Every structure is written in structure tokens, then in C-alpha cells.
Amino acid sequence: MTEHNVRNFNINFGPQHPAAHGVLRLVLELDGEIVERVDPHIGLLHRGTEKLIEAKTYLQAIPYFDRLDYVAPMNQEHAFALAVERLTGTQVPIRGQLIRVLYSEIGRILSHLLNVTTQAMDVGALTPPLWGFEEREKLMVFYERACGARMHAAYFRPGGVHQDLPHQLVEDIGKWIDPFLKTVDDIDELLTGNRIFKQRNVDIGVVSLEDAWAWGFSGVMVRGSGAAWDLRRSQPYECYSDLEFDIPIGKNGDCFDRYLIRMIEMRESARIMRQCVDRLLGDAKVGPVSSLDGKIVPPKRGEMKRSMEALIHHFKLYTEGYHVPAGDVYAAVEAPKGEFGVYLVSDGTNKPYRCKIRAPGYAHLQAMDFLCRGHQLADVSAVLGSLDIVFGEVDR
């Protein structure tokens, strides 16, 4: 009788693993140190968001979007606001568009800073997260000064934004950009040439362009494989078509390329922010920040103190809400994690009939098995980090 030394393991990665980015549970089948199969178990953070939205008015649905990708909340609201605006035919004034773009780019930097620095932490570098969180703290303060909340803003409303930015805040955001670019250079210097960081990321989790399209990837995941696909450029929304920025693309499609793209995107976001700040202090210094269509946007508070009609109007908008013409629309934005889309079906009432949320992280997570096969166990956390997954949007 011959004896065989079998080294097949089934292990659980998560749900409380420090590298699992939330409540992810992966069931791994290993042959020694080599991963043979990865089975993601999702649903641990499922809150029934899409069903809850069907019972709320269009205005009451906005806070649900903050809680999807809670790392960059305003980018999610943006997609929903665009969908409602397309159904109602609402135009957003230029100052409102610039504020939206400014805060969308702040969200992109928030997300990329968290991802790049925690990616470094997953492979064992402790300094970058400390630097990254210092910058994220300043950005959270900008969120707070715009709308009063650090995380769940409910600031992008259909028709524009909730309130105008103070002049001083716009100036402070402008002053923040240069020191931030210095921090990005510091993180760059620490990681990009670092031998250990390279060994942990180069040629790990390689995706060819055909595979990226086939798996339904978007955002950094397809750009890392060599496609210059960015919704801000290919299907421009708001005022992105008037702004100058470059789209970085990779050629190897591995974790390291995706890291490099996120680093460049932070610099490009800062460049977009500078253009927005210049215009908000220049030609768009004064002006409305939300649509003047009184059927969607509530009257100003001062007006309500003077006019009975405004008070009635405000009461109607916040109790019954506005009725959206029947129809369906798909609105997508280039969120930090990829293409975040909202498919909104209206039946002509004050509540959505159906609101399907297309989360980029969901499509990326399903490819975990394909990406990790044949890699070492330690590479699973590197691949997971480069996918940039947040569980709020995967489980919704």
C-alpha cells in the first residue's frame, strides 16, 4: 500500500479578515500554498436597498446611494440624480455642474487614496495608510463644510446640489491641491520603486483585455488592461467635455499597472479640481446651483418666510414629492471603482417603480476565482486589493 501525502485544504478567508475589505467571505480550495478555487460568499451586508427605494419618493431615495460605496458617497448620488434629471428633462446650471464635478473628483481621490494605501498595507507597508488618511481627513472636512456631513452627504439632488459652496471653501480647496500632489509624490516614491511592493504586485492577477470585457469589468480594471475607456470622456456628462484631463492606461493588466493608474488618476483628478476651482472663482462665481424648475427644486428658505405659496410648495415637495413622467432610463457615471449605473423605471407616480443599481464591484468580485487560480495564498489579498471592492455596493 503506497502512502500519498495529500495537502489539499479548504479554508475560510474572512468574514472578519483584516484584508477582506468589509464583510467578504471567500472559501478557498488550496493545494499546499497554491489556490485552486475561490468561492466568494456575498450577502452579509444585504439591506434590500433596491426594494426599499420603491417605497420612497425620489427625494427620499437619495440617502440610500450614500450607503452603497461609502468610501466615495457623492459619486453614487450623482448617477441617481442624472437618471431623474433625464426622465424629467431638467437642466443643471453651470455652477451646479462645476460643484458636482469638483465633489465627484474629491470622491475619486478619497477612494483611490484609501485603495492605494490599504493595498500597501495588505502587502506589509505601514507608512502609506498613515499619510493617506491624513489627506482623506482634510477631504472629509471639505465634505462637511459643503453639506454638514462627513460621509452620508445627500448633497447631489435631482436638479443640482442642495446648497451653494461658501467662497472661502472654494479657495481652501484650491489651496489644498498643491500640498496634496506633494503627498502623492511621497507615496509614489515610497511604493513605486519599492522592490518588495513590486514583487507582490507585478504579474499578479493578470487580465487580458478580452477577458476584462467578457467579465464585465469597468473603470481601472479595463484601463489597466489597455482600453482607454472612461465614461467621463466616452459618454461625457455634466461639464466634463469642457475640462482637460488625460486617461491613463496600462499594458500588462496586472495589480501593479492598476496601482499605477490609480496614482496617475489622483493627479488627473487634482487637475480637474483646479479647473473647477478656477471657474467657480471666475466666470461661474455667481449663479444658481440648482435648476430653477420649481416643480423639482424646493423654494429657498427666505422665500418661504415671505410667501405662503412657497411654503405650500415646499410642504408638497417634501411630503408627496414630485411626479416623474413614465419611462425608463439608464444613467451611468465613472465612479472611482468603475461604471456605476442606475436603471430607473418610472410609472408616472412620485415613487420609482424599479431602481436597478449596477455596482462595478459586483462584476469585479465574480472574477476572483478566474484571477486567483494558480496563484499563492498570499496573492489573494493583493488581487482583492487591486479590484477595489467595497461591500456596501456589492451586497446593497
Curated annotation (Swiss-Prot):
**EC?**
7.1.1.-
Q: Name one Pfam family in it.
A: Complex1_49kDa
Reactions listed under catalytic activity: a quinone + NADH + 5 H(+)(in) = a quinol + NAD(+) + 4 H(+)(out)
What membrane topology is annotated for this entry? Peripheral membrane protein
- Keyword Thylakoid on this protein? no
Q: Principal place where this protein is found?
A: membrane
In the UniProt record, does the keyword NAD occur? yes
Location in the cell:
Cell inner membrane
Record-linked SUPFAM superfamilies:
HydB/Nqo4-like
Keywords on record? Cell inner membrane, Cell membrane, Membrane, NAD, Quinone, Translocase, Transport, Ubiquinone
Q: Which GO terms describe its molecular function?
A: NAD binding; NADH:ubiquinone reductase (non-electrogenic) activity; quinone binding
Q: Which InterPro entries match?
A: NADH_Q_OxRdtase_suD, NADH_UbQ_OxRdtase_49kDa_CS, NDH1_su_D/H, NiFe-Hase_large
**An annotated GO cellular component:** plasma membrane
Q: According to the lineage, what is the superkingdom? A: Bacteria
What quaternary arrangement does the UniProt entry report?
Answer: NDH-1 is composed of 14 different subunits. Subunits NuoB, C, D, E, F, and G constitute the peripheral sector of the complex.
The task this protein performs is described as: NDH-1 shuttles electrons from NADH, via FMN and iron-sulfur (Fe-S) centers, to quinones in the respiratory chain. The immediate electron acceptor for the enzyme in this species is believed to be ubiquinone. Couples the redox reaction to proton translocation (for every two electrons transferred, four hydrogen ions are translocated across the cytoplasmic membrane), and thus conserves the redox energy in a proton gradient.
Which HAMAP family does the record associate with it? NDH1_NuoD
What does the similarity note say?
Answer: Belongs to the complex I 49 kDa subunit family.
Q: Could you identify this protein by its name? A: NADH-quinone oxidoreductase subunit D 1
Q: Which organism is it from?
A: Sinorhizobium medicae (strain WSM419)
Lineage per the UniProt record: Bacteria, Pseudomonadati, Pseudomonadota, Alphaproteobacteria, Hyphomicrobiales
The gene coding this protein: nuoD1
